[in-house]
């Protein structure tokens, strides 16, 4: 049930673009719905892997973004330093002597830092944004078309689990 929030974040980051492929799997324990789910989304230039697990003794709300120049890890349950920027990248070295069987991957690591993020109440901010959208007659970030896109992804993922 937390995947809906992750999908909303991905939808926002992707500016509403739909994935080109959706695959999902899960396991049922103790009830008729999946307790553990894995959803894989493919977009034009990258992939997303979501894991939801309400049985795990370790509660995590993390988002990892791996880019060509840097990597980010956002840990929502931490009280401080929720965002860590890794000055790290991976590059595939190519050349005449490198084939599919012996390609070379080079990892470059330059350290990490955590930018300051002012602690705020996410629920309050969401309600205030919605209120402001009504007062100013502007479209909210969580609008009907965004909700429909996220719902369609969830529906396809759920159907994949029942195959």
What are these regions (language model features)?
Residues 1-58, 64, 77-78, 145-148:
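Rossmann-like dinucleotide-binding domain that binds NAD(P)(H)
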Residues 4, 97-98, 117-125:
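Alpha-helix N-cap/helix-start motif at coil-to-helix transitions, marked by capping-box chemistry
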Residues 73-106:
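Mobile, glycine-enriched helix-loop/loop "lid" segments at the mouths of ligand-binding/catalytic clefts
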Residues 108-115:
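Short glycine/proline- and acidic residue-enriched helix-loop micro-motifs
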Residues 14-15, 88, 162:
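A generic structural signal for secondary-structure junctions
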Residues 115, 122-163:
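C-terminal helix-rich "cap/oligomerization" subdomain common to oxidoreductases
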Residues 42, 66, 84-88:
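A generic structural motif
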